[in-house]
């Protein structure tokens, strides 16, 4: 297998190197052909690499970057002042071909802006979108976009997202003729904002898109649609609400055995059995397992991790980058877009 190289913004996210460095080591252990360029402040990174496996360390190289993009930074200002930041250095490593993908848990708006400036968008795409492939009730996958890269979207952008999402579902999730829907407050054609209704009109008339209409938020995980399209505001709120509910549910399962000394032995045994069955049935819904959203529509691979990701979740984001490299996502998406999406003037 060909060697893979990922540039990683070690300083991004709520916890920085405390999470990113251990996650890197785990990803290296799982992928013997992987090399990671760890971008950030050496003084913060090096102590976390002490006494680690020598073979893993040989495939991990620290690239100095003294500055950090603050989580609360205003994108316009942070982009202008981005030179020397770990986020920009990591993206530039992809631009120059020294790395094949970039992973960051940093400021979403800044990452979006910098990625578009440094890597450029695929021809015909107005703005890249954050997309994630989520598990659904039918034990299949649902591609959801945009998840926060573009708060306001006109109808043309929603149409482009629909096309990209359909390509993603077909090429990556292996779904033939994927069903595409727009997120809305009802299924009736008259409902929704103007941009949503205008996008629906265009999608209905697009022969290469299997458009099925509107889907409400309560059907996000039912598998009713293979691709769910929305603006970044609605998508981000929907995703985080869904993840919060799932985490509460899984925590209730985890605590179901309890430590009550008055509980009979057979009741404790029953609870443990039930917990095991529920974990087996619903464990795949754990948000940590699908952390990482791809900035779809760029000429390079960029994976955005949740800022508050733990070690397991950040490792999942790195693994997603590995898969994206192996499957040559930008090239395959660009190839399909040439036949599906009309090029803009």
Curated annotation (Swiss-Prot):
Its EC number is 2.3.1.274. Keywords: Cytoplasm, Lipid biosynthesis, Lipid metabolism, Phospholipid biosynthesis, Phospholipid metabolism, Transferase. It comes from the Bacteria. Its main location: cytoplasm. GO terms for cellular component: cytoplasm. GO terms for molecular function: phosphate:acyl-[acyl carrier protein] acyltransferase activity. It is an enzyme of class 2 (transferase). InterPro entries: FA_synthesis (IPR003664), Phospholipid_synth_PlsX-like (IPR012281). Pathway: Lipid metabolism; phospholipid metabolism. It is found in: Cytoplasm. The keyword Transferase applies. One of its GO terms (biological process) is fatty acid biosynthetic process. The keyword Lipid metabolism applies. It catalyses: a fatty acyl-[ACP] + phosphate = an acyl phosphate + holo-[ACP]. Homodimer. Probably interacts with PlsY. Catalyzes the reversible formation of acyl-phosphate (acyl-PO(4)) from acyl-[acyl-carrier-protein] (acyl-ACP). This enzyme utilizes acyl-ACP as fatty acyl donor, but not acyl-CoA. PANTHER family: FATTY ACID/PHOSPHOLIPID SYNTHESIS PROTEIN PLSX (PTHR30100), PHOSPHATE ACYLTRANSFERASE (PTHR30100:SF1). Belongs to the PlsX family. This is Phosphate acyltransferase.
């Amino acid at each position: 297998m060909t060697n893979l190289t990922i540039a990683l913004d070690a300083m991004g996210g709520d916890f920085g190197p405390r999470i990113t460095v251990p996650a890197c080591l785990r990803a290296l252990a799982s992928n013997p052909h992987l090399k990671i360029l760890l971008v950030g402040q050496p003084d913060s990174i090096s102590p976390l690499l002490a006494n680690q496996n020598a073979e893993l360390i040989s495939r991990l190289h620290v690239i100095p970057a003294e500055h950090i993009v603050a989580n609360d930074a205003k994108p316009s200002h942070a982009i202008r002042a981005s030179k020397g930041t770990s986020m920009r250095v990591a993206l530039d490593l992809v631009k120059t071909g020294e790395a094949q993908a970039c992973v960051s848990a940093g400021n979403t708006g800044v990452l979006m802006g910098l990625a578009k400036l440094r890597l450029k968008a695929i021809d015909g795409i107005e703005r890249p979108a954050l997309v994630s492939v989520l598990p659904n009730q039918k034990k299949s996958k649902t591609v959801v976009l945009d998840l926060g890269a573009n708060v306001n979207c006109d109808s043309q952008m929603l149409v482009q997202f629909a096309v990209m999402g359909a390509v993603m579902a077909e090429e990556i999730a292996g779904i033939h003729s994927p069903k595409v829907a727009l997120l809305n407050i009802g299924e009736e054609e008259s409902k929704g904002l103007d941009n949503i209704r205008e996008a629906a009109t265009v999608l209905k008339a697009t022969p290469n898109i299997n458009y099925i209409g509107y889907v409400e938020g309560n059907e996000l995980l039912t598998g009713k649609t293979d691709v769910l399209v929305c603006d970044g505001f609605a998508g981000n709120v929907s995703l985080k609400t869904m993840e919060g509910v799932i985490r509460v549910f899984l925590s209730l399962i985890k605590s179901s055995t309890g430590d009550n000394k008055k509980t009979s032995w057979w009741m404790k045994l029953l609870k443990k059995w039930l917990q095991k069955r529920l974990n087996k049935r619903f464990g795949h819904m754990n948000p940590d397992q699908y952390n990482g959203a791809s900035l779809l529509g760029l000429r390079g691979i960029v994976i955005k991790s949740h800022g508050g990701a733990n070690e397991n979740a950040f490792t999942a984001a790195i693994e997603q980058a590995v898969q994206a490299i192996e499957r040559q996502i930008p090239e395959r998406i660009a190839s399909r877009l040439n036949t599906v999406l009309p090029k803009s003037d």
